Amino acid sequence: MNLSTKLEVSKNRLNTFFPLRTKDERKELDWDSILGNVISEVYRKQLAVENLTDFQAMCEQELKQRLDDDAFWPVLKAMYFDSSDVLKIAPEFLLFRSEEAEDNKHNQRIGDMFVNLMGGKTLLNLSPMRLNFVEQILFDVLENKALKPEAKMKKRVFKEQPYLPFLAQCFKDDLAFLGSKPRYLLDSFQDFLRLYGFLYTSQLAHNLVNWSEGEPKPCPNYLILDTEKASAERKQLKESGYQQLYNHVLRIFPYLTMAEMLQAGRDEVRPLWLLADSIRNFDPATALLNDFAQSFKDERQLIKVQVNAQPDSISALRQVLQLSRDQFKTGNKDKDDINTNFAKATIKHLCADFIQQRGAAGSVLVMNQDYLLLLTNLVIGSNESLRLNELIKGFNQRGVFFDKQSQAEIVQFYERIGNVERMSDSGDAVYVRKTV
């Protein structure tokens, strides 16, 4: 049983399974810094130099030793350092991005979210970049002089198991594919992280609603292309689109903080769905949770809320989770705003690229062509092409759903860019090729 045997009501603290905190609405994410943090874990490399200026001095010294004419250095400096193009040589150079950000803890937590999706494992079998003569020298300086030897690297321990195993597997597969194409990785890594930030947030929110149904699975989350019209007649978009997402995001802070409270003192905080599985049909948990519900109601002064003795452990846990939401519906604006502001921060920081205002239709979930192409390439992966219905299944497995109207628009988009072929006279067998 993952439930603590001594349940005590405490402050709401969120330390697991989601990177944002209640005060993060006022902050801005630095995706370059997040990218640098993830690169450090993916490549298992850490900088030994303080900043890019120190690295520039190392490169100047090395290149002047190799160049016949010192006058070449200012030209190279302008090409690579003044323009920051040095950061585009290879993914490892993005390590410098993480050193540039101030007030970096929230960016570090976002980076940790992606590392947790990897299961704490690094991907060491990444294909090398093809570099020109000068770039190879700069890369060698980075590798041989500007990075810490492995013995001196800080080793971080990631105990947290993935909350969404299905999405963690997709993330690892997609990252492995990107690692086989380092130039594409370099060009698209930030978009890749932004995409998975949205996918993780939306699927976590939806699966928190289904906490009693066992291991999470992809939940309907309907988007349209950003070039489409959003009519009110599109049932799936209306029922399983933006409004559903926002309503479910409101559960992230209450449910996850409650899950931590119920596992206080345990060596590891398990996902809520695993906590539920561990107490199912376990009578002692029922009494513990019933007593805790009354204590929580009293401590939070939820006068208008009724608490009843529940007959089984899952019903008792359901009541406790409802109380976790009720504490932010008291009419006390300061208290109620805690969860509302957390939800706004979540939408702002991790979902904004995928939301548009559409007049009378209100907010809708959208995907632009850049993200669609990236997602298409990721799903096709090591294959040369995929049949359209298999591609759509791959979208769904990652938490991206399109109705039939959007699917038709997607095929038209593929035809315009020339990466689709029809393998039968009727045109029923549509295959989509990747663009990398």
Predicted regions and their residues:
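An N-terminal, globular interaction/scaffold subdomain
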Residues: 2-210
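Long, internal scaffold/assembly segments composed of regular secondary structure
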Residues: 186-307
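Charged low-complexity interaction tracts in eukaryotic proteins
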Residues: 345-371, 412-436
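Positively charged, polyanion-binding regions of nucleic-acid-associated proteins
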Residues: 366-384
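Short acidic, hydrophobic short linear motifs in intrinsically disordered regions
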Residues: 384-398
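Short amphipathic alpha-helical interaction segments
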Residues: 400-413
